[in-house]
Amino acid sequence: FLGNNELFLRKYPFVDCVFRGEGEEVFPQWLTCWNQPELWNDIAGLCYLNTDKQYRDNGTARVLNFSRLIPPEKSCFFNWDKPFVQLETTRGCFNTCAFCVSGGEKPIRTLSIENIRQRLQTIHEHGIKNIRVLDRTFNYNTHRAKELLQLFLEYPDIHFHLEIHPALLSEELKEELKQL
């Protein structure tokens, strides 16, 4: 949640709490004690008003085991009817841009190339033709970017949307992009 969490919670008393950060690990934790607010103190990223109406802020939740998360496309709720799929291969960003809410999210956490290959195969089997790669800066690491581009070449019928930082575009990577 972005914004003034305390103000939001006071303005909308029917909202019990909001999460700040990455919720994949902490939301299930909260579900085990959602009706016991006295147990919410140790849930990272949770912001709420306690029983005395005092604002509690448990900071920002971060998923440290990014590679262990269950891929969204394995969920029974995943919507395969869209013309595209979003694919996150990294989390975090090495930049600290003042205008960006993601800046300074360190460390950068990555999925293995094999993990991404398996996910691409699943996506391909569902007939998806467009993938939006959600990485903050696809080419932050030239070697990894090249590996991913080579992997993408294995799926010529899929279009990949990438966000590339022009200042980090090496000659080596430019040559790799020309092959696409």
Question: Which sequence ranges carry the predicted segments?
Answer:
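Glycine-rich beta-alpha loop elements in corrinoid/cobalamin-binding modules
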Residues: 1-59
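A structural signal for well-ordered alpha-helical scaffolds and beta->alpha junctions
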Residues: 20-27, 62, 113-116, 145
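A conserved amphipathic helix/loop scaffold
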Residues: 50, 62, 77
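Radical SAM [4Fe-4S] cluster-binding motif and immediate context
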Residues: 67-180
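A short, sequence-level motif marking secondary-structure junctions
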Residues: 60-66
